[in-house]
């Protein structure tokens, strides 16, 4: 972490993650896409356990870790400038797991924060929140595992704050809980379009809160270590202006 361009430790409850962000100084020859790698490494010691294998090694990534990588990649990737082709790696290591608070949304917010202090060109900060819909018909922000399981529906929303103070939603991931149908049979409140619309509005408060915390972090880093030096990079054009003009005329 000390050698990374940006490193952040974030926590919710006793769940804690370390996220680092790094980018190559030069572009590899022939690179015609943005090589962004997002990795989430879950460690057994985070939950106070030691792997039981002979060599005490960690196993392959879990399904949850892979899904968290994809969930993190979605709002991050379009937030880099056009033409940026430097290989970039965002790595999150789960260093504490309290078995109550999930680390996936925390990882996205930590990734945004790490990029904000790294000097890597990034149009952030981004804020992300998970909201669970309870059987009583209330949206619960940043729910615990138990609150999500006892709810009928949950939604993960990522966004950025606009100049006018509104929030532009960049990603929505939603789905019903495993026992939702049983809860509905017992009379639980159902999720309608109006209810989802309320969630998209309510989430903006929590997204802004995450963004505000990241801006406070940036200000603290600048106050302690001086201005964040932006990395030097040159946009890679996929085509010349002449080719673009010719295609427009077709």
What are these regions (language model features)?
Residues 4-89, 94-101, 168, 173-188, ...:
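Glycine-rich, flexible beta-strand/loop modules in the N-terminal catalytic cores of phosphate-handling
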Residues 14, 108, 115:
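DPxDG-like acidic metal-binding loop motif
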Residues 1-2, 149:
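A short catalytic or substrate-binding loop motif that flags glycine-/basic-rich loops and adjacent residues
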Residues 51, 55-57, 67, 71-72, ...:
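Small-residue-enriched alpha-helical segments and adjacent helix-cap loops
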